[in-house]
């Protein structure tokens, strides 16, 4: 347990940031899951909007330092490939 006042405060701050980061990750995973579901259903109209939403959430996570930029780039690239495959099919 922390003894210094600043260390006690940092424990609270870290807990708060962890909660916020979990919310951001959850929102991102949900948007990716929705995009994959739309791709599986073959809905070409909504797939572009869902991709933009997922890409936006991934970029926001990178900007806030929640996930690494290479991880986001890899996920966006793979999702984009799936979207393009659906659009050309």
UniProtKB/Swiss-Prot annotation:
It comes from the Bacteria. GO terms for cellular component: cytosol; small ribosomal subunit. The keyword Magnesium does not apply. The keyword Ribosomal protein applies. InterPro entries: Ribosomal_bS20, Ribosomal_bS20_sf. One of its GO terms (biological process) is translation. It holds the Pfam family Ribosomal_S20p. Keywords: Ribonucleoprotein, Ribosomal protein, RNA-binding, rRNA-binding. GO terms for molecular function: small ribosomal subunit rRNA binding; structural constituent of ribosome. Belongs to the bacterial ribosomal protein bS20 family. Binds directly to 16S ribosomal RNA. This is Small ribosomal subunit protein bS20.
């Amino acid at each position: 347990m922390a003894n210094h006042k600043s260390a006690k405060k940092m424990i609270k701050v870290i807990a708060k940031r962890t909660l916020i980061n979990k919310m951001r990750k959850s929102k991102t995973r949900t948007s990716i899951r929705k995009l994959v579901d739309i791709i599986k259903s073959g809905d070409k109209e909504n797939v572009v909007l869902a991709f933009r939403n997922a890409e936006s959430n991934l970029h926001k996570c990178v900007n806030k330092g929640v996930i690494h930029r290479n991880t986001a780039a890899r996920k966006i690239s793979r999702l984009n490939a799936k979207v393009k495959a659906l659009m050309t099919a």
